[in-house]
Amino acid sequence: MRIDAFLPALTVSPATFISRAFEGVGVSDLDFESVEFNRKWDVRCVDERFAWLFCDASMIDTILELGDGVTVETFGNYILFTRDLVGDAAALLRFLEHVTQVPAHLNPLVREEYPTVAAMESRGMIDEWSQRPDGR
């Protein structure tokens, strides 16, 4: 799903035995207010502040509703959702309905704090312009 903000890399993935083993040796994920969420998912992000903005109570509830086995990632101006396609068509349709509601649950501060696509394109053009030889 494309949104109009460039986001830091974040991964919300199902907790596994291996991820719990890493936590046991000090490579921990981020924990939030929801005990159920912390038990079921690992959150890793290069920008902890962004992770807290993204994983607010509304988004945590949305991710919990998506069901077990779902991974949510942010990449540039995309929010990506992956899950196994095993299951009936009705379950897949419910999943897609929940995913389409994600923009409504996205914390408004995320859009305010992180640059828009137009701003990033503008920065790129300014950088290209400033690197011309002799400023011409």
Where are these regions (language model features)?
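Charged, low-complexity intrinsically disordered regions
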Residues: 1-136
